[in-house]
Amino acid sequence: MKLSRRNVAVPAGVAALALAVVAIVSWLPRSDAAPVPDGSDRLPASTTTVAVAQSLTSTSSTTLAGPQTRFVLPGDDLAAMVAANPPLTTFVLAPGIHRGHSIEPRDGQVFRGEPGAVLSGAVVLSGFAERDGIWFIGGQGSDGQFHGQCDDDRPRCGYPEELFVDDAVLEHVESVSAVGPGRWHFDYDQDTVYLGNDPAGRVVELGVVPSAFHGDADNVTIEGLVIEKYAAPAQEGVIDSRRDREDRVGGSGWQIIDNVVRWNHGVGIAATTGAVVAGNQVYENGQLGLAAKGLGVTIEGNDIYGNNTAGFNSGWEAGGSKFAFTSGLVVRNNHVHDNDGPGLWTDIDNIDTRYEGNRVIDNDRMGIFHEISYDAVIADNEVRGNGFGFSAWLWGAGIAVSTSINVEIYGNVVEGNGDGIVGIEQDRSDAPASYGPLSLTGLDVHDNFVSGNEGWSGVGQDIGSNAVFTSAGNRFYDNTFDQAGTHFFWLNEEVTYKEWLEFGQS
């Protein structure tokens, strides 16, 4: 007879032992007892009781905390706990706001959030004074370090601090005279914050901590956390498996799973070799949602949207994502939408890239952009509504390949973008070109559905040579184009569909 747990009797001795454990647990310190540095007394009584009782009656998975599990309450010094515990320790963060932590993990450590656990890089500001309809508070020290290139109308994008009123980010303006509703100014010389909204009855927070997790440890796991309001500089991640932005190696094997990463200044998540970034919501960060470098990085099943809130120049580096110096990068089944910049962007020495099954919708610049890089497959993506923020020439493409070698594009739906599918040849002698000379060569575009794009599909160059059309092996074939008019580009001019076919493209 197949036995189930409900009809298995528990031996009397085991039952007695379970009762004894319950009695012992009732004596253990409560979770609000005075903390110890390593968090080792943090076993909530209810969790321990259930876990031990289950372990005595079943071999199924339980919530029993092992000797390397530490429980973290809001107010605990998490960085000190990490330093006091060995590699492979698991830290379970309790519900609530954990403020001010910047963590350098050790190898194999796990950081897991219970529902409602929030890591915040912000401090709460109170005690504002008011003068002429502007509120201000002193004593807010910061180095005021600027990094990045900004849009003309957002000249303070490069300062990492952000100000929030009831979780809404305000625009950082250049002077006190420009402060008004929805705007603020940080006078770095006087250490004073000026605010154009009455803070009475509101929660006002200033992002000041540069990162939540950083460093080059290996095999770190970060799971189930809300991570918000960190003052990460541009080109640095709030979660970052590097020591700094110049580090092109970093740690390997990070698992960044099922987190919410929002309202931070620089990059939401910056991953390196062997990382898996999956199931995260990465939204409304100041510069980029995601970045990666290294070998074998997987980006899968993330929702990436609304990034570049600080107003960085998206031609410099801003938007949904940017990947550089990768090999074997896989970007699969992500929803990438409404970013102020490109949606998915591989730029500089990427090789063996695969973009597959992504929904790339309504991004301000190109939907998918593969630039000064090498072998790639762009397959089975849905690409709609991208490129209207800058659609001059061929730059509003749903899918764009620029000065890159051996890229195959197939099975995509490319509809309603500024341009369709394009290849671009430029002089990029400034590029590292680590895998050989760069040019638009071997572009293989087939079996795509292309419809309703305002501009063109095809190939263009600005180097004064027609070789890209005649001898570089760039071709379109077996595609379905559902649009009339001169929506095709060849020999550096717009052509009709009939002329497109006569050039041997389809």
Task: Give residue spans per PLM region.
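Extracellular polysaccharide-degrading/modifying enzymes targeting complex plant/algal/animal polysaccharides
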Residues: L56, L64-S252, Y497, L501-S506
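Bacterial N-terminal signal peptides
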Residues: A15-A23
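C-terminal region of N-terminal signal peptides and the immediate post-cleavage residues
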Residues: V22-S46
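N-terminal export and membrane-targeting signals
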Residues: M1-A16
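Extracellular mucin-like PTS domains
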Residues: S46-A51, S55-T63
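Active-site and donor-binding regions of nucleotide-sugar-utilizing enzymes
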Residues: G279
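Glycine- and acidic/polar-rich repeat regions and solenoidal domains
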Residues: S102, S211-F213, E228, A232-G253, ...
